[in-house]
Structures are given as C-alpha cells and as structure tokens.
Amino acid sequence: MNSRTLKRISNVRLKARSELKLDEWQQHNYYYDKNLVGCTKDQLERIDARNTTREEFIEKYERPGKPVIIQHLIDDWPAFDKWTIEKLGKKYRNQRFKVGEDDDGKSVKLKMKYFLDYALNNRDDSPLYLFESSFGEHQKKKRLLDDYDVPEYFSEDLFHLVGEHRRPPYRWWCIGPQRSGTGIHIDPLGTSAWNGLISGHKRWCIFPPSTPRELLKPTSADAPRNKDEGITWFKVIYPRTQHHSWPKEYSCIEAIQHPGEVIFVPGGYWHVVLNMDLTVAVTQNFCSSVNFPNVWTRVIRSRPKMSKKFLERLKRRRPDLARLTEKIDINGDTGPRSDTSSSSSSSSSADSSPDSADESDTESKVTTIHERPFDQGDESFVKKQRVTPLS
C-alpha cells in the first residue's frame, strides 16, 4: 500500500473498529493460515437456470424453504464486463463507499482508489469490507444499477409497495478482500435473500432455522474483541460443528460459491460467509408471496408504522395478501429473530438495517456431497453491520 492509502486506512480502522488498536489488526496472523481459504466441502445442491423455470424454482426450493445454488441465472449481466477491479478503479476512483460504521452508527467511508489498494495488499486478520447499501441513491454510484437485473426467480418484491424511501435497506453492492466476510446471522424481517457473485469465491456455512443461537454465536470468552467477524466464526465455531458431539439435527451445509453463481437463502436460515479471495458481488433481500406470512409477523412487531403503510398498499394492489393478514397469528412463534449484531451478511461490514436490524442475517438435507478443492490460481481479479444482508 502506498503512504496515502496507509494514512487513510489507519484512520478508517480506528473509526470502524474502535475496540482494536492499530497493531491488533494482524495479531492472529490469519493471513498465513491457508486452511481458512483453502479446500473445503461443497455440499449444496446446484440447479441450472436454463432448464429450471421460475415456477419450478418456487415449488421445489422457495416454497419448501430449501437453500440452493443456481447456475446460468445471471450470465447476461453487464457486470461481468464492467465490475473488474481495473474498471471499477477507474470509473469510481474518487467515489466514497461504506466500509463500516463508527460507535455512533454512522457510516465510515473510503474512496474506491484507497480501498482497492488496501484490498489487494493488506494482511489484516479480518479486513475491512466494502458493503454499500445506498449506491442506488447517489448520482454517480447509481450507475451500478445499470449493470445487473434482479433475476427472474426473485422478481416479486412486495416491499416496493411502501416506496423506496420507506422500505428497509434491501440491497448491497460489495467488494470483499480475502478473509473478510459476515458473521453468523439470520436475515432481517423474515426476508429471503439471493447473492450473485461476479468474481472470486465465497465460503458458506448454512444452518437450519431451529439451530439454537447459543450453539452458533461466538462468545466474548471465545474471542474478546472480534467475536462477530466471519473469520472468527470459522476459527472458533466451525471446528465444533465438525465434532461427533455436534447435534445431527443442526448439521451444517457447506458450500463454495463460484463466479457466475447465485445462492438462494430462505428466510430464517442461519449463515456465515468468508471471502476466499477478492470478491465482487451484489445481494438483495426480498419479501414475496411465499414468505409473506413470516415477514408480516416481523414487520408488524418491529416496524409498526411501516406495517400500516404496507397494509394500506396491499389492500389496493394485493387484496389477497391483505385478507391473509387477518388470519396470521402475529403472536405465534415465527422462529428465530435476526441479529442486530450480524455483520452483513455479510460482517466485516454491513448496513444498519439488514444484514440485519432487529433481526439477524442468514444461509437440508443434502443430496450430493463432494470435496471440491479451491484453486488459488483461479482468483478472479479481481463490522459488523447492524443489519445483516446476505453477504
């Protein structure tokens, strides 16, 4: 890193993770632990979008609540050409993007040119993670919206009824250096999520909604300062999940997401993500007719004002769902809440309100299990967030 980058990174580090001194960002030497980003299990089922219709996807995966990786769903995105590190560095060189939050919950931002220098050259244990939710509101950064389309499988977006400024944060554009990631979480408000990966590789561990929080969450005893970071989870909790004493009903589904693949995480699933190399991705949370009952119970509890506007719009645009709200038991057990401490869905950085707000972030029976080595040469050029989206 050049001297200008080092100066700015030091300032950002102190703001984004005030609990760490500058000389503690590399105290565990995770940069040298290649097991974290090396060979791992790849168990999650894959489907081919070229021979799977939207209706088939809904009936086989969304409705049953089954995580899956989808291939050839985003092959036509301009992002594959426009989101190379070189082109992003030129086009958005002086634009500032969110890489964390300070102790007051305010965004900590960094210019793209400094972040990319840092991303390619740092040796931090858990590097800063560019995780931007407001890119669609900025005159220059909103051009990113032209580079991708919401996949057909996830085209139903009921929260759009309440308006762009009233709805909770729901989309994140992210660049993750190797070893960055998001801590264990459930996505906010019962929403489901999809993550489209343009370059690099992501390591996922996904657990059933019924998995007890105390089994999955690192404690202060496990990690006094970095307990919410994705890499901490893989160092501390992951080995426990592989031990014979780990309850089989809470077994982990492991996956490696490759460039061009989309991962679908149904609402309620715990998930944790680690960037195995430099990654560029976009992720969105959504409410559809399928997950609406679970989302409604959480919205009416935690966002009462928005719920009134939502219901008002549903009566006009989706009277069938408006009638359904009268039958939903909002006091019933709707499963685990999302974590405000999740790190977007992502963690080295997320947004205050998903990757989780007052709920947590997310990611079974596996039909195929095989070992897939990760080729370090296949690298594509290429804090915890209050609201954690799908990393």
Description of each model-found segment:
Residues 269-271:
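Short, charged beta-turn/beta-strand-edge "cap" motif at the junction between a beta-strand
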Residues 1-262, 274-391:
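N-terminal accessory scaffold of Fe(II)-dependent oxygenases
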